[in-house]
């Protein structure tokens, strides 16, 4: 048995084509979705991520605005910029690129973004709504993961999902999203004593730990769906995931590659949230 490779880049392109059509229809009604991205400092990785978001906006027809601020900016000044964007009707989504400089409290910044424009899904109100199964902006990477699993046509309801990793960005929320889909969810983390045994029970295995090729075939139930969220750079310069892809390929039923797996879905779901926000706001641009 050789696993079917879930090509996240192809799924993302299909969804972006659908978003492009939606944006065209919105513009016919005078509604132009708008995303503001705040970049603080000159971190090369952050700048690269921001470029990807700008490119995605351009691709589907979303208006994007990049606000570049110096590393030395005060927290007060950054909060004032968010307040300005909260009140700007042209902007449906606000994203502050993380990480921020150490003198700025990320929690205060995230909580200042209006929940109606929280297209990253990080605001405590968004998280609370997600936890209780209410309509809200879902965090982009976890949402993208669920969409990739749905591409397999597997009925998630009743399946056992094992999540290895418990970060606030991926691990915790992705488990909650699968719980909302009526799956049975188990979390594993650095203190889990029988991780391999638990992992082998998974119909759907989500791995997000940041350790290159940690998960090998002996962690995998035959025929399982394996979603690899990790992105690690080896000494050779080559990218790899948290799953030993070649080793697991003959055991899993479905598997995502790294790169071109989960990554492309993250920005696509950000674009999706921005379009949804524009629909909800329904503000006609003049």
Swiss-Prot record:
Reactions listed under catalytic activity: (6R)-5,10-methylene-5,6,7,8-tetrahydrofolate + NADP(+) = (6R)-5,10-methenyltetrahydrofolate + NADPH; (6R)-5,10-methenyltetrahydrofolate + H2O = (6R)-10-formyltetrahydrofolate + H(+)
Positions contributing to NADP(+) binding: 165-167, 190, 231
E.C. no: 1.5.1.5, 3.5.4.9
UniProt cross-references to SUPFAM superfamilies, sorted A to Z: Aminoacid dehydrogenase-like, N-terminal domain, NAD(P)-binding Rossmann-fold domains
One Pfam short name: THF_DHG_CYH
Binding partners and assembly: Homodimer.
Protein name listed in UniProt: Bifunctional protein FolD
Species annotation: Bacillus cereus (strain B4264)
UniProt lineage: Bacteria, Bacillati, Bacillota, Bacilli, Bacillales
């Amino acid at each position: 048995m050789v696993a079917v490779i879930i090509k996240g880049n192809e799924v993302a392109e299909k969804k972006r084509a659908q978003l492009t059509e939606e944006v065209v229809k919105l513009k016919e009604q005078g509604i132009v979705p708008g995303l503001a991205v705040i970049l603080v400092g000159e971190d090369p990785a952050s700048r690269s991520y921001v470029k990807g978001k700008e490119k995605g906006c351009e691709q589907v027809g979303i208006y994007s605005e990049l606000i570049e601020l110096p590393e030395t900016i005060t927290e007060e000044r950054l909060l004032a910029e968010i307040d300005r964007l909260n009140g700007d009707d042209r902007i449906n989504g606000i994203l502050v690129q993380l990480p921020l400089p150490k003198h700025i409290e990320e929690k205060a910044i995230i909580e200042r973004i209006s929940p109606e424009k929280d297209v990253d899904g990080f605001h405590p109100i968004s998280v609370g709504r997600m936890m209780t199964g209410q309509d809200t902006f879902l965090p982009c990477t976890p949402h993208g993961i669920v969409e990739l699993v749905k591409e397999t046509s597997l009925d998630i309801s009743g399946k056992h999902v094992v999540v290895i990793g418990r970060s606030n960005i991926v691990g915790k929320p992705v488990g909650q999203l699968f719980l909302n889909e009526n799956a049975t969810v188990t979390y594993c983390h650095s203190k889990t004593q029988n991780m391999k045994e638990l992992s082998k029970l998974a119909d759907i295995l989500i791995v997000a730990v940041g350790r290159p090729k940690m998960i090998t075939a002996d962690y995998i139930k035959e025929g399982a769906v394996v979603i690899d969220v990790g992105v690690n750079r080896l000494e050779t310069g080559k990218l790899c995931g948290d799953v030993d892809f070649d080793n697991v390929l003959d055991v899993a039923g479905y598997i995502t590659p790294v790169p071109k797996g989960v990554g492309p879905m993250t920005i696509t779901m950000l674009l999706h949230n921005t379009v949804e926000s524009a629909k909800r706001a329904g503000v006609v641009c003049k």
